[in-house]
Regions:
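PRPP-dependent phosphoribosyltransferase catalytic core
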Residues: 159, 174-175, 214-220, 240, ...
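Conserved short alpha-helical segments that host acidic/polar catalytic motifs at enzyme active sites
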Residues: 1-223, 228-286, 292, 380, ...
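Short, glycine/charge-rich flexible loops or terminal/linker lids adjacent to PRPP-binding catalytic cores
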Residues: 308-353, 363-364, 391-399
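Generic beta-strand/beta-sheet core signal
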Residues: 106, 171, 179-180, 191, ...
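Secondary-structure transition/capping motifs at alpha-helix termini
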Residues: 126, 147-148, 283-287, 305-312, ...
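Phosphate/diphosphate-binding loops
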Residues: 157, 208-209, 213-217, 224-225, ...
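Amphipathic alpha-helical
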Residues: 136-149, 293, 304-323
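A conserved beta-strand->alpha-helix junction
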Residues: 130, 135-138, 311-322, 419-437
Length: 497
């Protein structure tokens, strides 16, 4: 698997608890979603304090840092950059000012129209410290809140402007907000801490973050919903009307932790079922089935169970090496595979093997693992992908925004098989994948090219010449003036700026 992660977000309102440490623990549970940087912002009733830096959660924070961040509300973020450069300036949360106070925002996802929105804000003398879409969102909310003097109005106006996939958490000194894109592409769940009736709440990208802080799952944040939590309790309103539901299906395939729950089912059980379906569609006559750790293992178990073949541990993962796909260049990715994985020769030597991975994206990782297994003595190596071919780039929070990098967009199955050096190669069908996941609407644009949110027309160079989606959008630029005029017409914003 060579996909880049997206990000993890967390928010907590718990006035009588150590919100900074709760956030720190939750970010540990979400560390798999991003390893570039980490950050925490805390509201203490008077102002917002923030600490963020590049590195893992354990590298950014120590006890002294957390002791210096008392408060009643907090948000946290662990980042893998999908829009904008990496570095301290791109670490989240991002800050913006509202009159005499501050807000801090953390974001998972990607905004497809952030370039044009950044230009609009720059023309209004708003400056930026980074080139990230997340800072654009923070500055948009700050701008509209300063104009209307209502934070929820500022959030709703921003939601009317931004396009793409997003789950965002935001704090001011005395309140927590959580909101999600109207298609529900990026995940966000609500949980409760403490006894029934206590005003202690958390929001997170995955339920595994609720578990680690002792929270009980309540529900998903609805697509288009804005949740506000303060001393007055929890309230909800719709910032946008929901559109056709389009949950990112790669949360099931790869991104989410196996112990997270989506639609009432553990991600582990879904991946196990994907492996069984894969075995039905692309069986192989072998002695041993192994999984590529960690995300390929549940599917490998299901594959072996369906074919009644021995399942074994043929690859050992070095858990102290950052994930290979986090590496910024192809050369470093290739080196990273060997740093991260090693084959068990006494398990695989002399055996015909099926190696199950969650996906084949660029082909680099698969090629190197096949060679590792051959070097360890495997007589045959058959590769199976527990997801369909990744043919189309993603623009909603996964760093595959260039079709030229996707091996299945350029090669047939047989050509990929030869490229990675396997004896055979098989992919789970899209129909088979959809039969395994909970029944709901999904974004499967990376497999099908059906994009739920229109792609800006100037993204055309990111597609191969023969592959263009149907819904390239000519321009998003004019909408800014329309939203401003609507606020003026409703008496929420002064007509003279």
């Amino acid at each position: 698997m060579e996909l880049h992660e997206e990000c993890g977000v967390f928010g907590v309102w718990a006035p009588d608890r150590d919100v900074a440490r709760l956030t720190y623990f939750a970010l540990h549970a979400l560390q798999h979603r991003g390893q570039d940087s980490a950050g925490i912002a805390v509201g203490d009733g008077q102002t917002v304090l923030i600490r963020k830096d590049t590195g893992l959660v354990t590298e950014v924070f120590n006890n002294d840092d957390l002791n210096a961040m008392p408060g009643k509300v907090a948000i946290g973020h662990c980042r893998y950059g999908t829009a904008g450069a990496k570095g301290w300036e791109s670490a989240q949360p991002h800050m913006s000012s509202i009159d005499e106070t501050l807000i801090a925002l953390a974001h998972n996802g990607t905004l497809v129209n952030f370039d044009s929105l950044r230009e609009e804000l720059s023309s209004r003398q708003i400056s930026f410290r980074s080139n990230t879409d997340s800072e654009v969102a923070a500055q948009l909310i700050g701008y509209f809140t300063r104009q209307t003097h209502r934070l929820r109005t500022g959030i709703a106006a921003t939601m009317n402007l931004i396009e793409g996939g997003y789950a965002m958490v935001l704090i001011r000194e005395n309140a927590l907000y959580a909101f999600r894109d109207p298609n529900g592409i990026r995940p966000l769940v609500l949980g409760h801490i403490g006894e029934e009736g206590e005003n202690n709440w958390v929001v997170a990208s995955e339920t595994c973050a609720l578990d680690i802080v002792g929270a009980t799952y309540v529900r998903e944040v609805a697509p288009g919903e804005i949740i506000r939590i303060s001393d007055s309790g929890l309230s909800s309103e719709m910032g946008l009307s929901p559109r056709q539901q389009a949950d990112c299906i790669f949360e099931q395939v790869y991104f989410s932790r196996p112990d997270s729950i989506i639609s009432g089912r553990s991600v582990y059980s879904v991946r196990h079922q994907m492996g069984r379906q894969l075995a039905k569609e692309t069986p192989a006559d072998v002695d041993l089935v192994i999984g590529v750790p960690d995300s390929g293992v549940p599917a490998a178990e299901g594959f072996a169970q369906e074919l009644d073949v021995t399942f074994g541990t043929g690859l050992i993962k070095n858990r102290y090496v950052a994930r290979t796909f986090i590496q910024p260049t192809q050369q470093l990715r290739e080196l990273g595979v060997r740093l991260k994985l090693n084959a068990l020769s006494d398990v695989v030597a002399g055996k015909r093997i099926v190696m199950v991975d969650d996906s084949v994206v660029r082909g680099t990782t698969s090629k190197q693992i096949v060679q590792l297994l051959r070097d360890a003595g495997a007589t045959e190596v058959h590769v199976r992908s527990a997801s369909p071919k990744v043919i189309w780039p993603c623009f909603y929070g996964i760093d595959t925004a260039d079709q030229h990098q996707l091996v299945a967009a350029k090669m047939t199955t047989q050509e990929i098989c030869e490229y990675i050096g396997a004896d055979s190669l098989g992919f789970l069908s899209l129909e088979g994948l959809l039969a395994c996941v909970p029944s709901r609407g999904y974004c499967e644009s990376c497999f099908s090219g059906r994009y739920p949110v229109a792609i800006p027309e100037d993204f055309h160079q990111r597609f191969l010449p023969e592959n263009k989606p149907d819904n390239l959008h000519p321009s998003y630029a004019l909408k800014f003036d329309q939203v401003e005029q609507q606020l003026i017409d409703e008496g929420l914003m002064p007509s003279e700026q």
